[in-house]
Amino acid sequence: MMSKTYHIAVLPGDGIGPEVMAQAYKILDAVRQRFNVRISTSEYDVGGAAIDRQGSPLPAGTVAGCEQADAILFGSVGGPKWEHLPAAEQPERGALLPLRKHFKLFSNLRPSRLYPGLEAYCPLRANIAERGFDILCVRELTGGIYFGQPKGREGTGPHEHAFDTEVYYRFEIERIARIAFESARKRRGKVTSIDKANVLQSSILWRKVVSQVAPDYPDVALSHLYIDNATMQLIKDPSQFDVMLCSNLFGDILSDECAMITGSMGMLPSASLNEQGFGMYEPAGGSAPDIAGKDIANPVAQILSASLLLRYSLGLDDAADAIELAVNQALEAGHRTADLAGGGSAVGTGEMGDIIAALISQGA
C-alpha cells in the first residue's frame, strides 16, 4: 500500500516572498528524505506578482489550485508598486482577505518565543528576558467588532457619529476555545482567556462559553484575564503565559505585542485554520520590498510556517519537531541573518536555509 501524498499549494507572492520561500522548499526536501513522506508542491501567483502577470491579485487559477491542496504555504504580498490601485484591488486586500473568507479560516495561531542567544534583541529588561517565553496567541478571525453589523457613519456637524458592533455567537466562541485547548494539550497545558467581562456583554458570553468548554479538557488549566491587565502582564512577565485565547480585536493587539517583545519579527510564523484543519501558513512580517533580492532576508519565519503546516494540517508532528529543533540548533551555533547579527558577521538568506536543511537531514 502506497503512503499518502500530501499536496501543498505554494504562493510565494511579492518582495522577499520568493527568496524566503526558496528556503522553505529546501526544508521540505530534507523532510521528504529523512521521514520518507510524499509531499508535492504546486506554485501559484498571488498579490502584486499576480497583478503584473494576470491582472488580478487573486486569480481564479490560484484559488482552484488551493482548493485541490491539503494546505497553503503563503509568502508575503504588497509593496509600493501597487499602492496606487484602489484599496480592494491592492495585493493585501485583494488576496489575503478573500483567501481567508473563501476557505473559512476562523482561527489564527501566532507563536512567539524568545530564542536562546537572542535575549539582547528583546526590548524588555534583561532580568525579564532571561526567563524566556514561548507563547501561542490563538485569535478568533472572522467574528467580533471587525465584522459585526450594523457599522457606519451618520450625521453632520457636532452630531456626526460613527459606530461598530461587537457580535459573538456561542458557536464562534466554542470552536476557537477548542482550538486553544487542543493546542495547549500539545504544549504546557495552560490557557489564559482574554476578555473585558467587567464591561462588555460580548465578553461576558465569551467567558461563560470558554468556562463551559474547559471541563472537556481536564488536563488543561484555564484562567481569565481582562485585556488591560493582560497587556500589562505580558510586559511584566511573559514567561507566565502558554496559550492566550483572544477575540478578533484583542488578539489583533496582543499578537503584535507578543511579536514585538521577541525583538525578531523575521522569526515569527502564523497559521490560519478552518474547522476541517485546512490552513494557510505565512510569516507574521511583511514583504519588505526594500531588501528583496539582496540575500539578506531572514527565512526562519517562512521555514517555521512550513513547520506549522506539517503539524496542524498534515499531522506530521515528528517532522515539525525536527524543523523547530534544527532552527534552535542553527541559532545556538551562532548563525545569524543580518537582522540579528548586530553588526557582526551574518549569513545570507540562502546559506541560512542550507544550514537548517542540513541539520534536519543529519537528524539534528
UniProtKB/Swiss-Prot annotation:
Keyword terms: Amino-acid biosynthesis, Branched-chain amino acid biosynthesis, Cytoplasm, Leucine biosynthesis, Magnesium, Manganese, Metal-binding, NAD, Oxidoreductase
Organism superkingdom: Bacteria
Binding-site list for Mg(2+): 228, 252, 256
Cofactor note: Binds 1 Mg(2+) or Mn(2+) ion per subunit.
Pathway(s) the chain acts in: Amino-acid biosynthesis; L-leucine biosynthesis; L-leucine from 3-methyl-2-oxobutanoate: step 3/4
Binding residue positions for NAD(+): 79-92, 286-298
GO molecular function: 3-isopropylmalate dehydrogenase activity; magnesium ion binding; NAD binding
Keyword presence, Cytoplasm: yes
Cofactor(s) this protein requires: Mg(2+); Mn(2+)
One annotated GO biological process: L-leucine biosynthetic process
EC number: 1.1.1.85
InterPro entries xrefs: IsoCit/isopropylmalate_DH_CS, IsoPropMal-DH-like_dom, Isopropylmalate_DH
Reaction equation(s) it catalyzes: (2R,3S)-3-isopropylmalate + NAD(+) = 4-methyl-2-oxopentanoate + CO2 + NADH
Subcellular location: Cytoplasm
Disulfide topology: none
Residues at which substrate binds: 100, 110, 139, 228
Leading EC class: oxidoreductase
Site label Important for catalysis, positions: 146, 196
Function text: Catalyzes the oxidation of 3-carboxy-2-hydroxy-4-methylpentanoate (3-isopropylmalate) to 3-carboxy-4-methyl-2-oxopentanoate. The product decarboxylates to 4-methyl-2 oxopentanoate.
Family: Belongs to the isocitrate and isopropylmalate dehydrogenases family. LeuB type 1 subfamily.
Name of protein: 3-isopropylmalate dehydrogenase
Gene behind this protein: leuB
